[in-house]
Amino acid sequence: VIGGAECNINEHRSLVLLYYSSRLFGGGTLINKEWVLSAAHCDGENMKIIYXXXXXXXXXXKDRQIRVAKKYFCRDRKKSVIDKDIMLIKKPVNGSTH
């Protein structure tokens, strides 16, 4: 978000950050304990999901980073244009409340 304001961590518990290559690259929404919905153009190698982050300080959120188990895209998606720009991310199942 450009020009956004920090919010209380409990206001948007379903929001996550997508992080890879030492930088934040996008966001997503928790659908349930196993799945995150994001835009396909936010895909990256060795992506991690950061949950319960109140600020964009990813270095302080090491304990809230999880690896991606698998990513799914539309079969007939065209990368050359923003077409069917949806990515489902399966995350490892754990006992977290996030």
UniProtKB/Swiss-Prot annotation:
One of its GO terms (molecular function) is serine-type endopeptidase activity. Pfam families: Trypsin. The active site is at residues 41, 85. It comes from the Eukaryota. Its EC number is 3.4.21.-. It is found in: Secreted. InterPro entries: Peptidase_S1_PA, Peptidase_S1_PA_chymotrypsin, Peptidase_S1A, Serine_Proteases_S1, Trypsin_dom, TRYPSIN_HIS. Inhibited by PMSF. Residues 1-98 form the Peptidase S1 domain. Glycans are attached at residue 94. Keywords: Blood coagulation cascade activating toxin, Glycoprotein, Hemostasis impairing toxin, Hydrolase, Platelet aggregation activating toxin, Protease, Secreted, Serine protease, Toxin. It is an enzyme of class 3 (hydrolase). GO terms for biological process: proteolysis. Expressed by the venom gland. One of its GO terms (cellular component) is extracellular space. Monomer. Thrombin-like snake venom serine protease that preferentially cleaves the alpha-chain of fibrinogen (FGA). Induce platelet aggregation in the presence of exogenous fibrinogen. Possesses esterase and amidolytic activities. Belongs to the peptidase S1 family. Snake venom subfamily. This is Thrombin-like enzyme cerastotin. It comes from Cerastes cerastes.
